[in-house]
């Protein structure tokens, strides 16, 4: 991909994307396909109407080299929407717009993904899937020393650990599998000794 801007000469297209960035021309060459200033301005207008928080400077920065996965995602969704739903989209822009999607989608592998948000209590409490102490668990004696011990991550990958007291399995199904380490047996029959399977 070649990204080209110019701030000398006659402005090629009268649009805020060029005016507010002090440019006279802008274009991108993707896979030997020329993407003109007119096309980029058209995409910007639709993008801005769908995602009002974007401005001319942010859009230009993203075109030069995306550094935010969320902005890149909304940019690609906008172009795909234009290609599939926009009846006013000129036919001569279809191939260049498709080339833009093809090139910019490759940036995803280079962008560091944001840390996933989680509603999993075990993930929030455990640091790097290490056991953590809890003050009490319903069904265990109040004076018991209790730990939650993660035994697999969300993908089902087993977590290795050693040196724990007797481990008990809860019958509840959670996204994050864990067992309970206790120095005292449970008061409830719903907890069974975990055999490691």
Curated annotation (Swiss-Prot):
GO BP term, example: symbiont-mediated suppression of host innate immune response
The UniProt record lists the keyword Glycoprotein: no
GO terms under cellular component: host cell cytoplasm
Main location: host cell
Gene Ontology terms, MF aspect: RNA binding
Entry-linked InterPro entries: Tenui_movmnt_prot (IPR007974), Tenui_NS3 (IPR043105)
Gene3D superfamilies: Tenuivirus movement protein
Subcellular location: Host cytoplasm
Record keywords: Host cytoplasm, Host-virus interaction, Inhibition of host innate immune response by virus, RNA-binding, Suppressor of RNA silencing, Viral immunoevasion
Signal peptide (residue range): none
Protein role: Acts as a suppressor of RNA-mediated gene silencing, also known as post-transcriptional gene silencing (PTGS), presumably through the binding of dsRNA.
Family, as annotated: Belongs to the tenuiviruses p3 protein family.
Assembly description: Homodimer.
Descriptive protein name: Suppressor of RNA silencing p3
């Amino acid at each position: 991909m070649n990204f080209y801007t110019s701030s000398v000469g006659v402005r090629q297209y009268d649009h805020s994307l060029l005016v507010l960035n002090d440019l006279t021309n802008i274009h991108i060459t993707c896979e030997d396909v020329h993407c003109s200033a007119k096309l980029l301005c058209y995409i910007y207008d639709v993008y801005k109407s769908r995602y009002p928080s974007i401005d001319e400077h942010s859009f230009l920065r993203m075109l030069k080299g995306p550094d935010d996965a969320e902005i890149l995602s909304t940019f690609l969704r906008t172009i795909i929407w234009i290609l599939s739903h926009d009846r006013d989209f000129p036919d001569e822009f279809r191939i260049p717009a498709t080339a833009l999607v093809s090139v910019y989608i490759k940036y995803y592998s280079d962008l560091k993904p944001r840390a996933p948000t989680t509603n999993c209590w075990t993930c929030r409490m455990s640091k790097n899937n290490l056991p953590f102490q809890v003050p009490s668990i319903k069904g265990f004696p109040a004076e018991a020393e209790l730990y939650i011990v993660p035994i697999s991550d969300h993908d089902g990958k087993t977590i290795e650990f050693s040196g724990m007291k007797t481990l008990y399995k809860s019958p509840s199904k959670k996204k994050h599998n864990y067992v309970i380490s206790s120095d005292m047996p449970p008061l409830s029959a719903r907890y069974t000794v975990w055999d490691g399977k």
